[in-house]
From Swiss-Prot:
This is Photosystem I assembly protein Ycf4. The gene is ycf4. Its main location: plastid. The chain crosses the membrane at residues 24-44, 69-89. It comes from Phaseolus vulgaris. Belongs to the Ycf4 family. One of its GO terms (cellular component) is chloroplast thylakoid membrane. It is a multi-pass membrane protein. It comes from the Eukaryota. The keyword Chloroplast applies. It is found in: Plastid, Chloroplast thylakoid membrane. PANTHER family: PHOTOSYSTEM I ASSEMBLY PROTEIN YCF4 (PTHR33288:SF4), PTHR33288. Seems to be required for the assembly of the photosystem I complex. One of its GO terms (biological process) is photosynthesis.
């Protein structure tokens, strides 16, 4: 996820895109793997060698191995197409708009196509109480226990409660988190709390 910032005296806009290199890489790997499984199943069904590097693929029976590979190949292609459409439609991307002129904060996110594609949350600036940095400890690792300290920037409001402004997936360093929180608190004229 990349965050682009545009700023003027009265408007601060964070543009958020959801397509990360890891998402593209995983969609590509799933597509290639499922396509390979489907080609092996077709090769088994036809009894022909569609792959130049191995003659053994066409020798195993279609039932049950080839049919199972066809099932997994088709399922993988559906998952891969779903991931590619999510990337193309930029689902989860959007804008965070802080507008002093209209005294509103808007959070706009893109959803799936349809009636409610744009998800909009509008908050009047007089409801914003503070910007908070909340640090947490997360345990990671399967075989080894690794503790990581992560900070998240929240906007505290009267009606909505705490609204997350950064996510763990943003991979922001502690100085970047502090800079973003300080910039927002200064721009909005609210206190910054730790």
């Amino acid at each position: 996820m990349s965050i682009l910032k545009k700023r003027s005296k009265e408007v601060l806009i964070y543009s958020i895109t959801e397509s990360k290199i890891s998402n593209i890489f995983s969609a590509l790997i799933i597509f290639l793997g499922s396509l390979g499984l489907l080609l092996v199943a077709i090769s088994s069904y036809l009894g022909m060698d569609l792959f130049l590097f191995s003659e053994e693929i066409s020798n195993f029976p279609f039932i049950p191995q080839g049919a199972t590979m066809a099932f997994y190949g088709i399922g993988g292609l559906f998952i891969s197409f779903y991931l590619w459409w999510i990337l193309l439609w930029n689902i989860g991307g959007g804008f965070d708009i802080f507008d002093k002129k209209n005294k509103k904060v808007c959070f706009i996110r893109w959803g799936f196509p349809g009636k409610n594609r744009r998800i909009i949350l509008k908050i009047p600036m007089n409801e914003i109480q503070s910007i908070r940095i909340i640090a947490g400890v997360q345990e990671r690792g399967i075989l080894t226990r690794t503790l990581t300290y992560e900070s998240i920037v929240y906007m505290e409001t009267i009606e909505q409660g705490f609204i997350t402004l950064t996510r763990i997936e943003d991979n922001l360093t502690p100085p970047e988190i502090a800079n973003k929180a300080g910039e927002l608190a200064f721009f909005l004229g609210v206190p910054l709390l730790y």
